[in-house]
Amino acid sequence: MRSKLLMMAARSLSTPARRPLRGVVFDLDGTLTVPNLDFKVMYERCGVDPKEDILEAIAKMPDAEAATAAAIVEEMEEEGRRTLELTPGAREFAEWLARQGIPTALVTRNTRATIDHLHATLWKGLPPFSPAISRDDTYEPKPHPAALEAILKTWEIADPAEVVMVGDSPANDVVFGKKAGVATALVDSGRRFVEGGSDEGASMVVENIAALAAGFHERFELPKAGPLQKYDVPSPSSDAGKAAVAGDLARLEACADVSLPDASGNTPLIWAADSGAADVIPYLRDRCDVNHRGYLGATAVCRAARKGHLDVLQLLLKADVDVNLPNDKMQSPLHFAAFKQNHACVDALLAAGVSRYVLDRKGRTPAEDTSDEEIRAAILAAR
């Protein structure tokens, strides 16, 4: 069922031999961000026929008229920057690409000011797009391939098929990518039907941008996608760790420093969460880093979610925890709870605002990583 859901989420229209994925280039409006400009109003205010390209039309106007129209465009774009939002799954997909070691670039008809605003706000904490090409640059607009060819040159990529162009417009983004020889991914938000219904031969078509991760994992060789390894199950080696597993508060209070990890990397808080020792969680929660990544990168929240310790999880959620922080295998707390079919933990994490689109190393969301139909339905309904 999980494989069927993945096939529905990411429809691969062609299956060439697996190539390395060396970069992803994005469109902005409708792909990474929710469209928030009323272009009908913009065209009307500028006195431009909707069938024309507004920027080209303004360039042909007399100077005074062009200045007025340009000011209208800037005014509306400034308001657009203030209300800019990412599309669902965009940030999670960007985080997945970053963890896979895949560089990203941007080509948009927005201004440099909009790109700078994006980097400083919604994209904060993520690798910036480099190159990030706006209409302030000198390249021909999409679908002319000049901007994309410049990115390939900057990245020193000889084989364009090792790069993917991601966009929501068949006429602009898909054709743009195909002219440069790169693979193409269409985020099918419905725009293609406005443009005539064709996907213009996109290599992949998805309904949500996060679904591209599974498609990329299947289609390409990823830089950091090594084989899955088996690891030993550790035991606590410190007095504090052993006391935490036993739920012995008196022994913990006698320890010199309960915040330190032991040889496994686990803090006493992680050991307590793993064993379900709820009675000592408040004491350790106040003395340990609640977001510390222990053995294989798992946090206390990860361990509680995996083991189904709802009482422990609820106590941890009262602290300033990162509920989406994954382990080294890119498994998040919601992945663990969903895969292990811990219904109550899934509900608690959803109520805490966990991401419904967080992706594991294979590009699966928690809804795709569970065989429990009820859990899957709950996660999808919460999107």
What kind of feature is each model-predicted range?
Residues 10-63:
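Active-site neighborhood of HAD-like aspartate-dependent phosphohydrolases
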Residues 242-247, 271-277, 303-309, 336-342, ...:
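Ankyrin repeat A-helix N-terminal signature
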Residues 2-23, 95, 111-113, 117-235:
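Asp-based, Mg2+/Mn2+-dependent phosphohydrolase catalytic module
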Residues 248-255, 277-285, 309-317, 342-350, ...:
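Ankyrin repeat structural motif
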Residues 79-106, 112-116, 145:
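Short, acidic loop-to-helix structural element flanking the phosphoryl-transfer center
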